[in-house]
Regions:
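Conserved beta-strand hairpin/beta-sheet module of binuclear metal-dependent hydrolase folds
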Residues: 1-39, 143-155
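Residue-level marker for buried hydrophobic side chains located in beta-strands
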Residues: 22-24, 47, 71, 150-152, ...
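Active-site metal-binding loops of divalent metal-dependent hydrolases
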Residues: 26-28, 51, 76-77, 136-137, ...
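Metallo-beta-lactamase
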Residues: 44-54, 81-131
Length: 275
């Protein structure tokens, strides 16, 4: 696990160097200077769980730097790597134009010929089995390492920052789908992984326990948001963090799961369900 030291903080965004130049989710380009020159060999493939900037934002910059680099991503996410205009507009609405460069750095397009589109139907690539696991994002996939049994789950198993056991489900807009997420947790469980490899942050050595934790938290948060009381939801979310984590870790939890975004994603989910 490479700690990308996003915004100068440890334990927020991890990039997984698996083997032989394979990287799962390189993170944002704003954090690349913290780690890219320390690699023993050039990366040859990026395995993206999804295209959100905290996971995949550096892809275009890395492809430009390493001429043999291939990028694997779900077929629904591939067009947005090639032309990131819509992705950037969506992120700018969420974070504000004044914060985009500080948070994420350059988001460069990836040439189409360098992208391999995946279906997530159980195909095997680069020693991984790939399963489509929507819920956090419609194009999210999980990679099961067929050698180690580790499952690289992106955001599907939640945010859990050591040394604390608190699990938060990241639910930013616009594509959160609670029903799909719950189904995807069953898909991940069915892979019978040895460990879950989390982007935020580290490893979950007891996969079923972690999946149960994110399932419970997701259902609880969704129910709170459905009541329509934004202030009550945000108060409960903030209090949960502060009751468990020390102040330094609490900052990291909020960096990985900005509370207002968690409300916005679930509020949009319920609103669209009712349309």
């Amino acid at each position: 696990l490479i700690d990308t030291m996003h915004l100068g903080r440890d334990r927020v965004i991890g990039a997984h160097l698996v083997r032989d130049g394979l990287i799962v989710d390189p993170g944002p380009s704003s954090a690349l200077p913290n780690w890219i020159d320390e690699l023993d060999e050039p990366p040859r493939a990026l395995m993206l769980t999804h295209i959100h900037l905290d996971h995949a934002g550096a892809s275009g910059v890395l492809v430009r730097r390493y001429e043999d680099l291939t990028v694997y991503v779900h077929e629904a996410g591939a067009p947005h790597l090639v032309d990131p205009e819509k992705l950037l507009k969506s992120a700018t609405r969420l974070y504000g134009e004044e914060n985009m460069n500080r948070l994420w750095g350059e988001v460069a397009p990836v040439p189409a010929e360098r992208v391999v589109a995946l279906t997530g139907s159980g195909e095997e690539v680069e020693g991984f089995r790939v399963e489509h696991t929507p819920g956090h994002a419609s194009h999210h996939v999980t990679y099961l390492d067929l050698g180690s049994g580790d499952a690289f789950v992106g955001d599907m198993a939640g945010v859990r920052i050591p040394p604390y056991d608190l699990t938060l489900p990241p639910t930013p807009p616009p594509e959160v789908d609670v029903e799909a997420w719950l189904h995807s947790l069953e898909t991940i469980s069915g892979l019978e992984p040895e460990r879950l490899r989390l982007t935020h942050f580290g490893d979950a050595a007891e996969p079923e326990r972690q999946l149960d934790a994110v399932r419970e938290a997701l259902q609880r948060n969704a129910a709170l948001v459905r009541r329509g009381d934004r202030e009550a939801f945000l108060d409960a979310f903030e209090r949960e963090i502060d009751d468990i984590a020390d102040p330094e870790t609490a900052v990291r939890l909020r960096q990985a799961t900005p509370p207002e975004q968690q409300w916005l994603g679930l509020e949009r989910y319920w609103r669209k369900r009712e349309e």
